[in-house]
């Protein structure tokens, strides 16, 4: 082949350098499938600016965005799960724990902290769905109880953000025991008059929804969160019927009276502060309009 033929036989694309786009710069919305700039999405608290879909958010990031800057202090950060049953399904439970810890950088699926919200003392907790589906095992139960006890000690509100597939099957009855354990400590809080607010996020299912997640003095949900005991596919397979549109979503539950309110993530911080100031008889951190009677 002559030199001139070699030049013209080259593909136009072979001389074009591909753009080197670092991984993680762009994120596709799981609802509308719009491609979003990741930094913009992070600034928007992982809510799609195009369609308003609330994506899942890292538990630690959620709590740090909620609390006043530099006010957070972690509770029971040293607790780690143990494979006391030597459980094995397709993989050893011990290996699943190690993989989840490596992937998330967390020791288990619940993060608990003290801090302030608009200068009001508060105890907070959040489930990390990325850690084994946010499942509740012995450590999750223990950390929840320690957080509740801290709230009673400080006489301040406790707010928990749930995102879980339910009890952790690899811990068998030890995980189911956490349902009673967490419910019992909330009963103690109620006796002492310490407020507990439960915020249900997508998804909140199984043993978590059947215990502490639905036991708030006020039960709040994020928009379109999936909330229930069994998931919709399991229910459809059991009853052999098509479920109503939006069944088990937060809007459906609000309509049926199962939850108290739906709050957008961007409004969560201000809403919680306003509600907690009323529950604790403290001045509101915001200037609220005076109520005017109809006959005035």
Curated annotation (Swiss-Prot):
Pathway: Lipid metabolism; malonyl-CoA biosynthesis; malonyl-CoA from acetyl-CoA: step 1/1. One of its GO terms (molecular function) is acetyl-CoA carboxylase activity. Binds 1 zinc ion per subunit. It comes from the Bacteria. Component of the acetyl coenzyme A carboxylase (ACC) complex. Biotin carboxylase (BC) catalyzes the carboxylation of biotin on its carrier protein (BCCP) and then the CO(2) group is transferred by the transcarboxylase to acetyl-CoA to form malonyl-CoA. A zinc finger (C4-type) spans 29-51. Keywords: ATP-binding, Cytoplasm, Fatty acid biosynthesis, Fatty acid metabolism, Lipid biosynthesis, Lipid metabolism, Metal-binding, Nucleotide-binding, Transferase, Zinc, Zinc-finger. Its cofactor is Zn(2+). PROSITE patterns: COA_CT_NTER. This is Acetyl-coenzyme A carboxylase carboxyl transferase subunit beta. GO terms for biological process: fatty acid biosynthetic process; malonyl-CoA biosynthetic process; negative regulation of translation. Transmembrane segments: none annotated. Zn(2+) binds at residues 29, 32, 48, 51. One of its GO terms (cellular component) is acetate CoA-transferase complex. It is found in: Cytoplasm. It is an enzyme of class 2 (transferase). Belongs to the AccD/PCCB family. Its EC number is 2.1.3.15. The keyword Lipid biosynthesis applies. The keyword Chaperone does not apply.
């Amino acid at each position: 082949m002559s030199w001139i033929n070699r030049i013209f036989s080259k593909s136009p694309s072979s001389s074009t350098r591909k753009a080197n786009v670092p991984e993680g710069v762009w994120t596709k919305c799981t609802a509308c499938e719009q491609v979003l700039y990741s930094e913009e999405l992070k600034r928007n608290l992982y809510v799609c600016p195009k369609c308003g879909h609330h994506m899942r958010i890292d538990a630690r990031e959620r709590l740090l965005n909620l609390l006043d800057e530099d006010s957070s202090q972690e509770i029971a950060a040293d607790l780690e799960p143990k494979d006391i049953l030597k459980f094995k399904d397709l993989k050893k439970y011990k290996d699943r724990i190690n993989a989840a810890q490596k992937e998330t950088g967390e020791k288990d699926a619940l993060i608990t902290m003290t801090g302030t919200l608009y200068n009001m003392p508060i105890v907070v907790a959040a489930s990390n769905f990325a850690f084994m589906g946010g499942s509740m095992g012995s450590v999750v139960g223990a950390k929840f109880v320690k957080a509740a006890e801290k709230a009673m000690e400080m006489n301040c509100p406790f707010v928990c953000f749930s995102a879980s597939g339910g009890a952790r099957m690899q811990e068998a009855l030890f995980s189911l025991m956490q349902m009673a354990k967490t419910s019992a400590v909330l009963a103690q809080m109620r006796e002492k008059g310490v407020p507990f607010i439960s915020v249900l996020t997508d998804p909140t299912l199984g043993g978590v929804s059947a215990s502490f997640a639905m036991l708030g003095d006020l039960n709040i949900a994020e928009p379109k969160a999936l909330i229930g005991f069994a998931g919709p596919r399991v229910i459809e397979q059991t009853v052999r019927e098509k479920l109503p549109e939006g069944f088990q979503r937060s809007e459906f539950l609000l309509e049926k009276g199962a939850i108290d309110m739906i709050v957008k993530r961007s409004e969560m911080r201000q809403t919680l502060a306003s509600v907690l100031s009323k529950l604790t008889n403290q001045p509101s951190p915001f200037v609220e309009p005076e109520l005017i009677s109809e006959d005035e």
